[in-house]
């Protein structure tokens, strides 16, 4: 996968355009993110459309990208900002404005249609910052 194509995926993801999953994921894609695993385009859409984006703005940045014919790897920084107070999210109870910062490495297996067939997320850190500015490393959140 060319870096320009990958960065277009990130742009669409940051715009919360879940049709990007139709264009970039293999129908039987498998994702492992910490202890959370799900399959397929519908699994990815459910995760983000129903569990993440209603509660958080999520912005990805990719300072490093490498690829060959069958895989890509990136360094990823992600900032989640709670949209509103919510008692029950994937990250637990949150208050509007609290943030969660992910730093890690993600490996993508790419099929012959130039779509992601497997996504493996590895955490370096996951940090919660409360409204008083207190930061706490959470390890793997789910």
Give, region by region, the residue ranges found by the protein language model.
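C-terminal and inter-domain tail/linker signature
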Residues: 1-142
């Amino acid at each position: 996968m060319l870096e320009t194509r990958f960065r277009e995926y990130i742009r669409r993801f940051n715009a919360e355009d879940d049709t990007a999953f139709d264009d970039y994921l293999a129908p039987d894609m498998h994702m492992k993110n910490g202890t959370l695993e799900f399959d397929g385009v519908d699994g990815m859409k459910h995760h983000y459309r129903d569990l993440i984006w209603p509660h958080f703005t999520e912005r990805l940045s990719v300072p490093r990208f490498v690829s060959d014919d069958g895989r890509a790897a990136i360094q990823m920084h992600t900032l989640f900002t709670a949209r509103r107070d919510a008692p029950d999210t994937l990250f637990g109870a949150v208050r509007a404005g609290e943030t969660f910062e992910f730093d890690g490495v993600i490996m993508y297996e790419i099929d012959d249609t130039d779509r992601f067939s497997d996504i493996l997320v590895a955490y370096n850190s996951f940090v919660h910052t409360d409204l008083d500015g207190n930061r706490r490393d959470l390890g793997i959140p789910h």
